[in-house]
Amino acid sequence: MKIVILGAGSVGSNLHHGLSLNGIRAELVHARSLTAEGAPAKAEVPEADVYIYAIADHALREVVARVDAPKALHLHTSGSMPIEVFGPDKPHAGVLYFFQSFSREVLIDEWSGIPCFIEGRNIDDIAAIYSLAQCLTSRIYEANQHDRERVHIAGIFANNYSNLMYRIAEDVLKGTQIPFEALLPLIDQTAAKVHVMRPKDAQTGPAKRGDHEVINKHLEILKTTPYAELYQALAALIGKEHSR
């Protein structure tokens, strides 16, 4: 089976790396060559049995339209784009959505525990996508667009927004002699707890306890920063959640 990955960004680079580690050769094609001004309507891409589009959502339709391979299996890797992005000229199509945070700077070596959400146009396509996903992980779930969109939103809260909280925490420590590394055991313990208990049950802190004296003191310290309003909103949300 010949595989071509279209897009050499964070997702494409990691997929290429992961497949290579598992003995599967895949050719990586840079998206720039497919979306550059003056690029031909039908791109010259290597022939393949499977095309994996690791392309940003805003450019996906453009790249899909430029690939002329009606017999191949076409897969996108997006959590929010529908399978219908592949038109009738691509009858074999689906989704291969690995639910992980990817970056080109840190390539992932261990894929076996990464969830993969798949969708296909028919039973045969689903079977082929499942077999491909199995080369990397055993945690494979069929998921339509409705479910993928919601898991994508959940992932943004759990990953992207939590990472923003780390950056804010780092900023709050500026002007002190305390390094961000002092927070790492706390961060690790918080993540470890949700492996064995519900997030609601793992919640701690002054907002859960209804300790308004501490909350108000923190708001006073934060009043000259951009974070006071966010702190107050989060404290109110936690307080409401735990007053039920």
Could you tell me what each predicted segment is?
Residues A26-A31:
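Short beta-strand "acidic-cap" motif of Rossmann-like dinucleotide-binding folds
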Residues G9, R32-L34, N122:
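Residues in the short beta-alpha loop(s) of Rossmann-like NAD(P)-binding domains
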Residues L15, N22-R25, H92, I108-H195, ...:
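Internal alpha-helical scaffold of NAD(P)-dependent oxidoreductase catalytic cores
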Residues I3-L19, G210:
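Glycine-rich adenosine-cofactor-binding loop
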Residues S13, H17, L21, A65, ...:
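Short, well-ordered alpha-helices that flank and scaffold nucleotide-derived cofactor binding pockets
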Residues L15-H17, S33-I108:
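Rossmann-like NAD(P)(H) cofactor-binding subdomain of soluble oxidoreductases
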Residues D188-R244:
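Interdomain hinge/lid region at the active-site interface
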